[in-house]
Amino acid sequence: MVKIYIDPGHGGNDPGAVGNGLREKDLTLKIAKYMRDYLLNNYSGVSVRMSRENDKTVSLSARTNDANKWGADAFISIHINAGGGTGFESFVYPNVGQATRNLQNAIHGEVVKAFSGFRDRGKKQANFHVLRETKMSAVLTENGFIDTKKDADFLKNEANLRKIGEAHALGVAKYFGLKKKAQPK
């Protein structure tokens, strides 16, 4: 059983980035649920746990401790960017092993397709808590810029959030070689 830990960024009293009438915490939760549902409905041999399934406050250490204790095989942290840019980028901890880079490559490649027409900002490294304190391969994604109108308009469309979530799931499925269910839901 492959164990996937999905971490929708922010939540509760931490809205994350805010812009164009959107809150990061709401978008990350929607994307995470689409990712979870796609994995569970379409693949066998996979188990999913989420750091939160509603709008509640969860500390960074609670997220990583939960994933470590559960024995997750992969940790995927979903975020929305801010700061006036545009497009998609992904992060891993600096100098990680090839396995984590392969997971990043698989997810990045699928999500970039969901963001067609947007800038691919590249595969990056960062010393983020959720990448540093996890004991399994961990990838953090930044899915568009909430404070850029073009990106925000894209993120306001529920079908696009679904596409992004499903792309995350496809990347994970590809990396782990998950078996498709005979009758996907």
Where in this protein do the model-derived segments appear?
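Glycine- and acidic-residue-enriched helix-capping/strand-helix junction motifs
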Residues: 16-30
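Active-site-proximal helix/loop segments of hydrolytic enzymes
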Residues: 2-3, 26-185
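Short, surface-exposed beta-strand segments enriched in small/polar/acidic residues
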Residues: 4-16
